[in-house]
Amino acid sequence: MNVYRTREILKTCSVFDLKLKVAFYARVSTESEDQQVSIHHQDEYYRNFIAQNKNWVFVGAYIDNGISGIRTEKRDEFQRMMADAKAGKIDMIVTKEITRFARNTLDSIKYTRELLMYGVCVWFQNDNINTIDEDSELRLTIMSGIAQDESRKLSNRIKFGHA
């Protein structure tokens, strides 16, 4: 997908009007029962969400189960998704929110920029950010910074027994 051409097209239509190869990325950090239910629901939801759009073709599910979001190199499905994006197999990745994709601002920006270089946008659905939008990087930086700080606070609470 040509990002600049697509941005021009989106001035007169929505992302739902585009013919796209769409995948989703989901991640939970533990294998607790609650998180397993969450990952199952995310899987089901995104498969249905993508299938309901007649212009989109579902091309893959990338699910990292029971893996921390701090280090992307330890997330096999994330790495497979990046390789498939580079190979031109994906136009858009849908994910629940920024914290599922990356746990720090630098990784959020690094990987979304890399994906855009491959012609792939990322839609952080709950955060209402799609990297195909021209102003997305500013909003992504702000929201990623907030998410990173929340992660730091939670880590400190756990460390001191206040979680």
PLM region spans:
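Short, structured surface patches at the beginning of a domain
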Residues: M1-A163
